[in-house]
C-alpha cells in the first residue's frame, strides 16, 4: 500500500513505472507512456510515480524522468535508465519520479529529502554556451531548473550526474562547451560508453568530492559531448579534472546544503560494477538526505 507523503492524498494518483526494452537498446528500461501521465494532470490530479514492489520509506529522492522514443507511439515515453533507480535503492533511498508538468506542485506534495539530476540528451539554455546553439532550453531542461530552484529554496542535498552536473553549473553562471570530442582521437574521446573505464580524473583537495571518496585519483567512465568550461566557472569551483583538463566535477562556492555535487561521469553505472568511490558518492548523498551525517 502506498504511503503518501502529505495529508492531501486525494490529489495524487499512484502510478508505477513499468519495464520495456526499446528497439535501440540492449537493456531493460523503466518507462511510462506520456499520455498516461498527461491524463492524470487532465483530471486535475498529480502523479505519484514510483517503482513497483518497493516500500515507500525515507529518505525520498526526487528524480526528473528522462524521455525515449518508442516506434509505436507518436509522443516520447517518460523513461529511466535502471541504474539510477538501483543506485538510490541500494544506498537506502526511495526514488520518486517527477514528470515535466507542474514540477513545483509535484515536489511540494511529495516532499523529497534530496534531488538527483540525472544525465541525458536535452537542450540546456542557449545563453549558457560559449558557442550558442540554435535551440533554446526544452521542457525537460525547464523541469530540471525548476527542481534545482526547489532544492535551493528548501536547502536539499543535490547530486548532479553528467548533464545534471552541467545544469548545476549553468544555473550558477558557468559556461558550457558544446563539442569537447571534436578535436579528440578515439582514445581521448569523452564518449566511450557508460561501463567502460575510460580515463583517470584528479580529485582536487579540500573539496566535498575528496571528503566523500577519500582518494586523489579515480578511474571513471565517460559518455558526454558537452562540458563546463574551465575559464568560465561562474559561482562554482572545480572538484575534479581529467588529464586533458576537462572539468569532471564541480561544487558551488556557496552551497545551499552541505552536500551539493556535480560529476561528469556516471557513478550509478560504476556502482553496478562494484566501484567503491561510486558507492561512497551515493551512500553519502542518501545518508545526508536522511539526516544521518
Residue ranges of each PLM-predicted region?
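Active-site-proximal beta-strand elements of phosphoester/diester hydrolases
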Residues: 261-264
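Active-site loop->helix "elbow" adjoining a glycine-rich segment at hydrolase catalytic centers
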Residues: 163-165, 172
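N-terminal beta1-alpha1 cap of cysteine-dependent amidohydrolase-like domains
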Residues: 2-159, 170, 177, 181-212, ...
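Short, basic/aromatic recognition patches
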Residues: 222
